[in-house]
């Protein structure tokens, strides 16, 4: 474990390896008034992110909120459903491509599931018109779409059952909310040093915080519905399947900020994906307050996307995916190759105090779209 001290608090990092930029980003948080006396805990999958490290958790103890810390994919997570059996992968892949838009694409029309939730639909429309001042139609049509980058749809085999894992978030809707409120933070932040030198750490206060928290929760609901719609588009028996949702990039009811980290409350089921080749672990949380009742959300990147595309070869990517059905192994997704991520075992070695690993599931089918 590494301890990093700052003006307002200290951070504990649950790994012995930390890159310099990540260390700097953590120290910036510890020197930030928003985290005075806050318990800051960094998960073992930590790596530098846009303005803040991935794997960040902290108590929310003031009304000073930094939208950039929650990030742009608000409410992103993995919906995991236990399957009644394995589908034919070719047919499944064709159905996915027909029914679930990916990458930058949205649906041709608003999905019925959103129309069946008029309160959420109204809130999305309100945010688009009053906060984002943008066309609501595109965002509404994004419910039921996957996205690109590290988002995926995967079928994995466990000891007795197979599982469908759907990793997606709030799409461009969450991005626009994050960008809008971070701009408000920059415009209204009273800290001249932050405004001049570290705009990504400018914070909201008062009514602006309340407005952000309200709209962030709408984005979380958007993301949860998005994953659920994808599940129902892919499986005819979706309503009958046992499932659980594991969310990162949000502030939950326990008032813990989690960016690239998931809640691991006592008895709570969660999943930690590692990479396209090695699959995931299903865990039960221990509710360990020393970890802010949190767990890593994945293995964490060892290479930036740019570095991965420059240094990895398609041939080694293809070799690493032998035995896994995928029509997505290409130069366009090379930045998601297993070798671009940290060794999953090193991350799993550091989570036993916060979560019990109950099952390892291995991928037999994987779908990803380019960034």
Report each predicted region and the residues it spans.
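Catalytic-core region of right-hand nucleic acid polymerases
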Residues: 71-87
């Amino acid at each position: 474990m590494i301890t990093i001290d700052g003006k307002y608090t200290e951070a504990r990092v649950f790994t012995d390896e930390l890159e310099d930029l990540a260390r700097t980003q953590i120290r910036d948080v510890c020197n930030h008034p928003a985290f005075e006396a806050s318990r800051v805990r960094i998960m073992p999958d930590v790596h530098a992110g846009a303005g803040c490290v991935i794997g960040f958790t902290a108590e929310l103890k003031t009304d000073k909120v930094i939208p950039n810390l929650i990030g742009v994919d608000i409410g992103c997570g993995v919906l995991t459903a236990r399957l009644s059996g394995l589908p034919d992968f070719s047919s499944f892949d064709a159905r996915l491509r027909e029914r679930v838009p990916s990458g930058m694409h949205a649906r041709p029309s608003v999905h019925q599931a959103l129309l069946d939730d008029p309160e959420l639909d109204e809130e999305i429309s309100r945010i688009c018109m009053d906060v984002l001042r943008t066309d609501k139609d595109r965002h509404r049509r994004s419910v039921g779409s996957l996205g690109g980058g590290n988002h995926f749809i995967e079928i994995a085999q466990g000891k007795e059952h197979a599982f469908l894992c759907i990793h997606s978030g709030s799409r461009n809707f969450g991005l626009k909310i994050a960008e809008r409120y971070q701009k408000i933070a920059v415009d209204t932040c009273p800290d001249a040093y932050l405004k001049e030198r570290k705009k990504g750490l400018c914070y909201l206060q008062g009514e602006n915080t309340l407005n952000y928290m309200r709209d962030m929760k709408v984005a979380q609901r958007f993301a949860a519905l998005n994953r659920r719609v994808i599940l129902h588009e892919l499986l005819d028996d979706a309503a009958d399947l046992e499932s659980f949702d594991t969310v990162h990039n949000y502030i939950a009811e326990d008032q813990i900020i989690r960016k690239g980290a998931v809640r691991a409350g006592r008895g709570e089921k969660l999943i930690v994906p590692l990479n396209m080749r090695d699959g995931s672990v299903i865990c039960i949380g221990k509710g360990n307050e020393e970890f802010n009742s949190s767990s890593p959300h994945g293995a964490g990147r060892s290479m930036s996307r740019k570095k991965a595309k420059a240094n990895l070869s398609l041939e080694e990517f293809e070799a690493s995916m032998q035995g896994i059905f995928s029509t997505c192994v290409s130069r366009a997704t090379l930045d998601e190759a297993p070798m671009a991520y940290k060794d999953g075992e090193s991350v799993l070695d550091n989570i036993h105090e916060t979560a019990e690993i109950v099952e390892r599931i291995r991928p037999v089918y994987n779908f990803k779209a380019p960034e």
